[in-house]
UniProtKB/Swiss-Prot annotation:
The keyword Transmembrane helix does not apply. Transmembrane segments: none annotated. Its EC number is 6.1.1.16. Its cofactor is Zn(2+). It comes from the Bacteria. This is Cysteine--tRNA ligase. A motif ('HIGH' region) lies at residues 29-39. It catalyses: tRNA(Cys) + L-cysteine + ATP = L-cysteinyl-tRNA(Cys) + AMP + diphosphate. InterPro entries: Cys-tRNA-ligase, Cys-tRNA/MSH_ligase, Rossmann-like_a/b/a_fold, tRNA-synt_1_cat_dom, tRNAsynth_Ia_anticodon-bd. Binds 1 zinc ion per subunit. Pfam families: tRNA-synt_1e. GO terms for biological process: cysteinyl-tRNA aminoacylation.
């Protein structure tokens, strides 16, 4: 099945027809603080895309950057370097700050089952290619030097801002650029290389043809893409806040460098909303994964919440919404645990042998429906609804329900199999009427000292994979 994605560049759906080597790049975190769950909604969306691609048979090469230098507090060309600012406030080096928060980021990713990239690109380790890109653009007369900084001249790139709807002919159009740099020729121009930092204590600087300085955030992503993926990129991921500045600047840099169109598909995830605003570190209204854990939520409760909404829709966050997701996830696990506990060893063997060896047409129909939903712009929320339909179905066997749940979980990544087994370790097996009858027969046999019959019943349960445990409260059934 071919994957279709909503393409921000074309404002339409694009098909991904190349199955052999899909190059995907995601804008990763700026490591000056803990990533918040608003950030992680975007990374979960990226994770769902990567897993869906691989599920559908695409071979994927997935890279993510780590911004440890050059991302200013204003996100444009104003403000202080975020990592430097945090380092100074905490009395640590930039390297200590960036390494600590990079490790914290990937630790939270593991808790949320967010896939680790095939390649992690740390900005400060790729300075030579960034300088080389600026030199080439300078040779093409696309840059200018002003007040100690190298600027990109957006008037040289006629399609600048098309993805964001910026019209360069309209001289009053500044999109999100509020603070106008008086040293720019055009309102939409942006810095490629800083040598005249607005702050004298800039810790990380490198020598360049324009003097000691450091790269801009936009240059970093563009140059690292060129170094790792060369002249082609299939999919670029990010949040909707990247559209109007960062990604249009990346496009301008790379396409002027290559003299051709670059990256056909840009995909953007919407905000996580809290109190009618996007979650934001700068505003101080943000929650981390650790905060959720301290309130007795599993990170997978938040992942479940993200699965309930399409990535292009804003998702409202509240503790009530998260609690509802927690209850729903636990209910799903409990139901699936009941199905699993009811299986005999033969049925378990069938389930564990080959998940996609469908024995019934209904299984294949549900599987095909799931594929159809996720392959059309990652409609994972519809896939989740389909899973609930399967769980509640009266026409499917327990094996069929579990088989489909485990298959869907290859993308959803709720750890369903692991959670079921953990659940059964901590709880007694739910017994059906036939089991209850045999347990009662065994109790009577023991009372009548008919130990042969009692042992026969015990052995019958053992062959099914169960252990009978006699307690003061009665006989409990556990997995063997």
């Amino acid at each position: 099945m071919i994957l279709k994605l909503h393409n921000t560049r074309t404002k339409d759906f694009s098909e991904l027809t190349n199955f052999d080597n899909v190059k995907v790049y995601a804008c990763g975190p700026t490591v000056y603080n803990y990533a918040h769950i608003g950030n992680f909604r975007t990374y979960i969306f990226g994770d769902l895309l990567i897993k869906t691609l691989r599920f559908l048979g695409y071979k994927v090469n997935y890279a993510m950057n780590i911004t440890d230098i050059g991302h200013l507090t204003g996100d444009l060309d104003d403000g202080e370097d975020k990592v430097v600012k945090t380092a100074r406030e905490k009395g640590l080096t930039v390297q200590e700050i960036s390494e600590f928060f990079t490790e914290a980021f990937f630790k939270d990713c593991r808790k949320l089952n967010v896939v680790y990239p095939d390649k992690v690109l740390i900005a400060s380790k790729h300075i030579p290619i960034m300088i080389e890109v600026v030199k080439i653009l300078e040779e093409k007369k696309i840059t200018y030097f002003s007040n100690g900084n190298v600027y990109f001249d957006t008037s040289c790139f006629k399609s600048y801002g098309e993805m964001a709807g910026i019209d360069l002919i309209d001289k009053d159009m500044t999109f999100s650029r509020v603070d106008i740099d008086k040293f720019k020729r055009n309102k939409t121009d942006f810095v490629l290389w800083f040598t005249n930092s607005k702050f004298k204590d800039q810790e990380m600087k490198w020598d360049s043809p324009w003097g000691f300085g450091y790269p801009s955030w936009h240059l970093e992503c563009a140059a690292m893409n060129l170094e790792y993926f060369k002249d082609t990129l299939d999919i670029h991921l990010g949040g909707v806040d990247h559209i109007g500045v960062h990604h249009i600047n990346e496009i301008a840099i790379v396409e002027c460098f290559l003299n051709k169109k670059w990256c056909d598909i840009f995909v953007h995830g919407e905000f996580l909303i809290m109190d009618y605003n996007k979650m934001s570190k700068s505003r101080g209204n943000f929650i981390t994964v650790k905060d959720l854990e301290e309130q007795n939520f599993s990170p997978l409760d938040f992942r479940y919440l993200c699965l309930t909404s399409h990535y292009r829709n804003q998702l409202k966050f509240s503790l009530n919404n998260l609690q509802a997701s927690k209850i729903a996830r636990e209910n799903m696990i409990n139901r699936l645990s009941y199905f699993y506990a009811s299986l005999d060893p033969v049925a378990l063997g069938v389930l564990n042998k080959d998940l996609k060896n469908f024995g019934f047409s209904e299984e294949k129909e549900y599987y095909d429906s799931f594929i159809e939903k996720v392959s059309f712009d990652l409609n994972i929320s519809q896939g989740l609804a389909l899973l609930w339909e399967i769980i509640k179905s009266e026409n499917l066997s327990f094996v069929s329900k579990l088989r489909l749940a485990f298959i869907f979980d290859e993308i959803m990544s709720l750890n369903l199999r692991e959670e079921i087994l953990k659940n059964l370790e901590n709880h007694d097996v739910v017994v059906d009427e036939n089991m209850k009858t045999l347990i009662e027969e065994r109790r009577i046999a023991k009372c009548e000292k008919n130990f042969k019959r009692a042992d026969e019943i015990r052995d019958f349960f053992a062959k099914k994979g169960f252990v009978l445990v006699d307690t003061k409260e009665g006989t409990k059934v556990k997995r063997g």
